[in-house]
Amino acid sequence: QTRYNTLHFLFRLPPMMKKPAFRSLLVGLLLIALAGSFWYSPAWLQLCYGLALFLFGMQCIEEGLHNAAGGTLERLMASSTATPARGLMFGMGATFVLQSSTLVSLLTIAFLSTGLIGLAGGIAVILGTNLGATGGIWLLALAGQSVSLSPAAVPMLVFGILAGFLKGRFAAFGRVLVGIALIFIGIDAIKDGFQSVGGNLDFASIRSGGAMEVAIFSGIGLLLTVVLQSTHATLILTLAALAGGQISVTQGFAIALGSNVGSSISTAFVGFLGSERSGQRLALAHLLFNVVTAVLCLLLWLPLTWLVAQAAGWLGFNSLLQLALFHTLFNLVGLAVFWKLQARLAESLQRWLPDKAADEVLIPEEIPEKTMRRKQARYLSDNMLRAGDTALRAVFQEVRHLGALSLEVICHVLFIPAEMLYQEEEPLLEPPEPPLQLDAQALYENYIKAPYSELLEFTSKMDIDDEAQQQQLLQAHIAAMQLVEIVKDSKHLQKNMQHYLQKPDSRAYPHYLRLRAHLFKTMCLFRRAAAAPAGSEAWKEGSEALDRHVATLESSFRSRVFDKLRQDELGSWHTSSLMNDTNYAKRIGSGFQEILRVAGAVG
């Protein structure tokens, strides 16, 4: 699921290609071509088989750790980014375990976008992911081409599958064991594939010139990493090709350099397409780190490769260990450059990518129906689904966004400028000036139903096992559903509001003005209470003020209408309309009260 979501971000199809028939045809042709290539080259089939096992093993490890840890990963990351050194260590450890710097970077972007960690802490984690990627490469290089990992993988696979029949964390740890076993088997299959290719694939004989050769193989490393979504997978292929003699050491260095840039490009795509400003800043930081480091290493290419060759001669390193050493030096160069600049980099990123001006008014006062566009959810993206805490926080943020939209839709229904909601002092409402024209149904469908549908789709994809988090998600659903019902109730008010507020000579006119003012004050009180932290004194005072105001509808407004009816100042037709609309107003007030109670239960 995670890998599919990432590739979906990277390779968005043009509109014509989004048609199901065309997409099915394209996928079918690709599968036929791939099957034909397998028949033509058994060695290529062996390589793809090993790569598929490796990537699926990574996915198994990710899923297993997520299910075993619950919210531990989220809490660990939040506590591990308190200092730059701890953030660096967390990035190194997480990358070594998950075997994917891209995955850890995307997780970090998700945490940052929901406010679980700060930008400075996220930058430290990103620096750690690059160093963490070197750990697995050193182990594989030390194991060498002659050491087979499959004997260790077989018992792990057996125990992992057996554990999968159990429940809870045992099944999750079994999933991790299966993932590790598949990675081991996949690595052996990749090595066997390159051995089978033998002399049929010999890039080492290519000598196109120093700079051109480095550029070509750096591009190969970049493209491989973007497609495979894993620096580790690219470097394992490189190690296997290097051990089989298909590429030279210098070409391997260039592929390693390109793979680092490729991982940051993948992160940048997802970060910019599926994140708020904070996530975009971190994606840019990752891209800057790897691009600047790559440029420096290219400028220092000759002394850097000479240093690796000299160290290899002193220490007796083979070509595989030389690649691991170069990859480590590459990341150490970047760390040396950026470590002292983290704070300044964070400040620069804030300046380059400032927070988008928070539109006080989400819905313009005048919206031509022909140009009305559906409002999209603001905080929901597939990247937020990578961890339970980030997904839950994104849901809470989106419910708040839906709440703001709901208040503004009701303002439009009542013919009140939405910007009046955000004034510090409660403004004095003026009677609306005719003509009053508005389609409440169109407002509901475009500004409420559309983001609410996205919210429902997002929550259907969430995988949360923790009971406390499940309860919080349920409360968020209740709050969102209440907001939708409140807007639906307000739609019923529009017909009479639009009719009577354009007739100052009507007996019902002053009563609809008072009902309009009552509802506006209800919204203002709710907005102020909801803005305070749940359970705080300000929240309690705001909730009590709302309760008192809602109660006045029954004790004051309704009784006054009946008095006017008895005094023959209102006709029965007007009274019937006012009573019906008073019921809708009461339901709107009760809905706001219920949302505050839900917020208090969640905390």
Task: Give the role of each language-model region.
Residues V27-A35, G87-G91, A133-I137, M156-A163, ...:
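Hydrophobic, membrane-inserted alpha-helices
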Residues L51, L55, G71, R75, ...:
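Alpha-helical transmembrane segments of multi-pass membrane proteins, especially transporters
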Residues P14-L55, A152-F159, V399:
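Transmembrane alpha-helices
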Residues L45-T108, G168-T238, L242, E347:
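Membrane-embedded alpha-helical segments and adjacent helix-loop junctions characteristic
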